[in-house]
Amino acid sequence: TNLKLRASYGKVGNDKLGATRFLYISNISTGGGVIPSLGRGQAINQGKLGNPNLGWEIAYKQNYGIDVQLFRELSLTVDYFREKREDVLISRGTVPEIQGVALGNLPKVNMGRIDNHGFEFEATYNKRIDKDWSFTVKGNFAYNKNTQRFMDEAQKPADYVYRYRSTGYSIGQNFGYRIDYSNGNGYINTQEELDKALATYQVGGTPRMGDFLYVDLNEDGIIDEKDQAPIKYSDIPRITYGFSGSVNWKNFDFSFLFSGIAKASRLYAGWGATEFANVGFFSDYHLQAWTPERFANGEEILYPALGSAPGTSQKPNDFFIMDRSFLRLKNIELGYTLPKGLLKKVGINSTRIYVNGNNLLTWKAMKTDVIDPEQGSDLNYPITKMVNFGINVTF
């Protein structure tokens, strides 16, 4: 049995400032055709300005932890951390365009500030019951939240319900339209609702029967980008967790591993999410799209009215910004080791026969099975289920 307390504080630098290199050098570009007054040369345009004063991002890190081991069987580890990142490399957002340089050509600067905090917990229990039986179980849980304190972001006008898109929010926070479920299902079901939408929607496209109803958050009688609000979370999971275990009985062994995430969201707008992406991709929940007949019959509706092109329903909203929380059985394996007495006669030291599976079960919050919550893009190769049979022989 032992107990260990840990604490640390440090100031560190981060030189991983993105893929763009040589930000301290100004660029110029040529083009635009031949100009006679320049001796038939080409025009020279100012490109991105360099910043010779760039430096590393600085992070102030704190960590406090405790390690406990009891009776050589149970071990616990708990950590709490805080991090303040300063001089984060960002693009200026509050410089007026009338200064003469296109905003996209302004140099990057060390001005951003981001805070992180969270905790991690891990527990392991090992037990040998007798000479034949033993088992191990292990679990972990982590919570992490980041907040962008300063990103030199220009404040939007006062008639925007939410005047910032970065400042005060987590990195990658999703914004979109909130669906109005006050009529029971959140769709335009009646001619009266359609007439109102036609008079108020300025989101791009023309609303139709079966499209989403949006909430006029600033109550100005118009549905437009001023009504966009933070939706769910960012793509970075706030919670990650997992648990695993193994059991041994005589010559048999069994193991499993589960992992999952929670409080993570992503905007899906490509293959599998919409019915018209990449010349058409009909998915499972499109079978339960809104139609007048389905609505009149009181059937379950899981998707807005189908179309051949993006409309008002395909804007960022709390339908297409999906909760990608999931719990997945990453691996499970059963094995048997043949008795050594049978093998020595043929010169074999050990033989183990096994069967295992990967990604066999997934529990997720999404309403469609076509999109996998672990994929970074709709075009990535999908996560596959696999079952393997094998034999390990040692001579």
Locate the predicted segments by residue.
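Extracellular/periplasmic, surface-exposed regions of secreted and cell-surface proteins
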Residues: 1-171, 316, 321-395
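Active-site-adjacent bridging/hinge elements
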Residues: 36-43, 90-93, 118, 215-223, ...
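Surface-exposed, low-complexity loop segments enriched in small/polar and acidic residues
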Residues: 95-109, 158-165, 173-178, 229, ...
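C-terminal extracellular loops and terminal segments
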Residues: 106-115, 157-174, 230-242, 246, ...
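Conserved small-residue
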Residues: 109, 126-235
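Glycine-rich, aromatic-lined ligand/substrate-binding cores of catalytic
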Residues: 234-268
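Extracytoplasmic gating/loop element in the C-terminal half of outer-membrane beta-barrel translocons
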Residues: 261-352, 357
